[in-house]
Amino acid sequence: MEITFQKVEHRYQYKTPFERRALYDVDVSFPSGGYYAIIGHTGSGKSTMIQHLNGLLQPTNGTVQIGEHFISAGKKEKKLKPLRKKVGVVFQFPEHQLFEETVEKDICFGPTNFGVSEEAAKQKAREAIELVGLEPELLARSPFELSGGQMRRVAIAGVLAMEPEVLVLDEPTAGLDPKGQNELMEMFYKLHKEKGLTVILVTHNMEDAAKYAEQIVVMHKGTVFLQGSAEEVFSHADELEKIGVDLPMSLKYKRAIEEKFGISIPKATLSLEDLTHEVVQVLRKGGHESCSS
């Protein structure tokens, strides 16, 4: 299910003295089945942008097309319920949205709300909890007896139980330790590969953006500043730093090595493994090449 933003603008508290423009002239497409990252400094418009994907927000100007659904300025999309089934959104700290007395009831809430029978919803709950790496035995427990990491996985299972075609992740690893972050990101990538899900990741973690995303969209002051593959985007390191976007650690180490040893590493290395390989290659050639990154 392809997603397209066409000249999208969004203003909060439109036509009031408190009006504030959050998005403008946003033109971007997310073809079906891809893995995408949206990055940018705090306040750049990332979260506002993704709230247009299932109709939580409506454009002030322009159109957002999600498959056969069109959300346009001044026009109400009548079929938001099926759209919200197709586009699953995992917001920051989703475990705060848990409320039922058992894990099973919490995961079943979404499917039953969309008309699925109780028996079918329970089956979806069993499948979803295994997808997120938890044991089915947890279904009978209160979600509030679980660890923070388990609660987050339960909340994500609730989204997956609705069998979305698009999975939108807004800082999904916020507050987790490094091990938990890595496990969750690997889980999302596995779901993307095995289920063919379109994944749109909003993140401040540049390592995750570089590692998983096929395309990266850089937002700045409410509009698209840059778009391309990880290699293309992070080759603009100076411009990114000027607008407050962090760089992957491998690029920071690359700069430090260049300055310390007086060598030039042409490639925009996106992992420590790549950096090690490139340093070896440069040293073998004598250590002096023009730096184009």
From Swiss-Prot:
Keyword ATP-binding carried by entry: yes
Pfam families membership: ABC_tran
Gene3D superfamilies: P-loop containing nucleotide triphosphate hydrolases
PROSITE patterns documented for this protein: ABC_TRANSPORTER_1, ABC_TRANSPORTER_2, CBIO
Top enzyme class: translocase
Chain ranges passing through the membrane: none
Record's subcellular location: Cell membrane
Residue positions binding ATP: 40-47
GO CC annotation: ATP-binding cassette (ABC) transporter complex
Domain ABC transporter: 3-246
Oligomeric and partner information: Forms a stable energy-coupling factor (ECF) transporter complex composed of 2 membrane-embedded substrate-binding proteins (S component), 2 ATP-binding proteins (A component) and 2 transmembrane proteins (T component).
PANTHER family: ENERGY-COUPLING FACTOR TRANSPORTER ATP-BINDING PROTEIN ECFA2, HEAVY METAL TRANSPORTER
Record protein name field: Energy-coupling factor transporter ATP-binding protein EcfA2
Gene name, Swiss-Prot/TrEMBL: ecfA2
